[in-house]
Amino acid sequence: MNTLFMHCRPGFEGEVCSEIADHAARLDVAGYAKARPDTACAEFICTEADGAERLMNGQRFDKLIFPRQWARGLFLELPETDRISVILAQLAAFPICGSLWLEVVDTNDGKELSNFCKKFEAPLRKALTQAGKLVDDPRKPRLLLTFKSGREVFLGLADADNSAMWPMGIPRLKFPREAPSRSTLKLEEAWHHFIPRDQWDERLSGDMTSVDLGAAPGGWTYQLVRRGMLVTAIDNGPMAESLMDTGLVQHLMADGFTYKPRQPVDWMVCDIVEKPARNAALLETWLGEGLCREAVVNLKLPMKQRYAEVRRLLDRIEEGFQARGVRVSIGCKQLYHDREEVTCHLRRLDVAKAARK
C-alpha cells in the first residue's frame, strides 16, 4: 500500500502534487507525485512500502490546502462479474475497518458512476461484515473505495479523524432559499471545516458582533445573521432588503479596504474579488491590530504557480504576526464551494471576546 490517492477540484491536480511533495520532503518520505490534468485526482507513489502510512501519520489532513480527500492503498482491476470476491481477496491483507465509504472523482465520468456505487454498496457492506473485515467502530481505519470505472477501483485506508469529514470531501449543504446569493455556502462550509461543530455555540454565538467587507448583496451576511450576530455590512452596492429587515444589519457605503470599526468585533469576513496579496493584508491588519478575534477571508488565485503563491502569502502572514508578537492560528483550504480561490481562517489566541454594544 505505497500509493497515496487524493481527490481535488478539477484543474488543481498540479497544486496537489506540489503540496504533497513538499510535505513528503519535510517528512523524509521518498517518492514522486503524478496526475493527469482535469481528472480531479492525484497520486503520490512512495518508494518504500510504509511511505504512504508515514506521510499520513506525519501530516494532519485538515492542514492540507488543495486535497479534498486522501487514502493510502492500491489500485485493483475488477472483472465484469463477481467484483466482490476479487475485492474481498485483496482486502485479506487489510486491517479490520470501522466504516466504509464508496467514492468517485469529481468529473462527469465520475458522477456517472454514482448510481453504480449506490447499488453496489449494500451487497459489498454485507459481504465485508460477514467476512469480519467491517465493524461499526470510528476508532478503526475507514475503508475508502474510489471507483475510476466499473472495472478499476482504488482500495484505500484513512483514519476517520485524519481525513475528510464528507465522502470525497464534498459537503452536503442545502442552499437556503432566503439567502441572497449562492456565495453563502462558502462561509457555511468554512465554518464546518475550520470550527469544530461542538464549538459553534461558543464561537458563533448570537451575542457577537461582526463586519462583512464587500458584503453586497449579502450572501455571507446572511450566515452571520442566521447565527444571530449584529453585522456591519461594508459595500457601496445594495444589500438584500430581507437582511436589512432583520434589524441586525447596519449597511455602510464605504471602501472595504480602508474601513475600520470604532470598537473591536468578534468576526470579520471578506469575499472581495481582489489581488490575493491585498486581501491577505486585510488579515494582517484586522487580526494584528486587534480589530477582530476571528476572520474568514477568500484569496483569489493567479493563473499559474497557485500553490507557490498561496504558500508565499501564508508565510508572509505568519511572519508578520510573529514580528508583532501576536499569537494566531492560521488555516487555509480550497473548499468545495471555492473556485479559483482558497479560504483562509485566522483566530487570535490572546484576546477576549468583544463586548456587544
Swiss-Prot record:
E.C. designation(s): 2.1.1.186
Subcellular location field: Cytoplasm
Catalytic EC class: transferase
Superkingdom of the source species: Bacteria
Record-linked SUPFAM superfamilies: S-adenosyl-L-methionine-dependent methyltransferases
A GO molecular function held by the record: S-adenosylmethionine-dependent methyltransferase activity
Catalytic activity, as annotated: cytidine(2498) in 23S rRNA + S-adenosyl-L-methionine = 2'-O-methylcytidine(2498) in 23S rRNA + S-adenosyl-L-homocysteine + H(+)
Principal subcellular localisation of the protein: cytoplasm
PANTHER family: RIBOSOMAL RNA LARGE SUBUNIT METHYLTRANSFERASE M, RIBOSOMAL RNA METHYLTRANSFERASE FTSJ DOMAIN-CONTAINING PROTEIN
Family that this chain belongs to: Belongs to the class I-like SAM-binding methyltransferase superfamily. RNA methyltransferase RlmE family. RlmM subfamily.
Subunit structure: Monomer.
UniProt cross-references to NCBIfam families, sorted A to Z: PRK11760.1
This protein's name: Ribosomal RNA large subunit methyltransferase M
